[in-house]
């Protein structure tokens, strides 16, 4: 085979495998940081998190809940039906703040998309990430690498989508900037 005297054939094949989220295993929570960046404890981030939470609840009438999800990869989500944000309770202050700014952006930007405003998931994620980055910059915080990577991935996905024009991307950035300004101008 290696001397090419025997005919060889290469095949690609797939088989079913089992994959687990670390939260579905018996790995103790205190060991999670060995495998995942759960953020870090910070009094400044905790205060900003509380400030953002208060903004959501008072200005947007959007409740913010911390829950235990059965997944480390699910960090949070905005539910337009109940106008609420659910965040994973397993993360530390820095990650909770980053996720809350992202989900707050969804609450502002995507609460009431009408049927004529069809946006791809990548476009909505890009808008929420851009708003989150602007808010974290406004607070003087370093942007987490995971947020930067997510923003870049969503941008690449949008650029690859032939139905999304450069004008649409510009509109998304304008939309994100208006959402950022609505928070920055009204946060206590």
Language-model features, listed with the residues they occupy:
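N-terminal accessory/interface modules of nucleic-acid-binding and processing proteins
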Residues: 1-188
């Amino acid at each position: 085979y290696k001397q090419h005297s025997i005919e060889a054939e290469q095949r690609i094949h797939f088989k079913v495998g089992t994959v687990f989220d670390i939260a579905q295993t018996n790995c103790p929570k205190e060991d999670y940081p060995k495998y995942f960046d759960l953020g870090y404890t910070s009094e400044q981030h905790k205060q900003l998190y509380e400030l953002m939470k208060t903004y959501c609840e008072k200005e947007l009438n959007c409740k913010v809940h911390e829950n235990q999800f059965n997944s480390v990869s699910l960090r949070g989500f905005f539910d337009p039906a109940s106008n609420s944000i659910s965040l994973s309770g397993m993360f530390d202050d820095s990650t909770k703040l980053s996720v809350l700014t992202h989900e707050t952006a969804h609450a502002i930007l995507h609460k009431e998309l009408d049927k004529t405003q069809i946006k791809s998931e990548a476009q909505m994620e890009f808008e929420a990430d851009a708003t989150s980055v602007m808010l974290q910059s406004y607070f003087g915080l370093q942007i987490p690498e995971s947020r930067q990577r997510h923003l870049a991935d969503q941008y690449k996905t949008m650029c690859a989508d032939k139905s999304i024009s450069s004008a649409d991307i510009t509109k998304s950035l304008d939309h994100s900037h208006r959402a950022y300004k609505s928070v920055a101008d009204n946060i206590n």
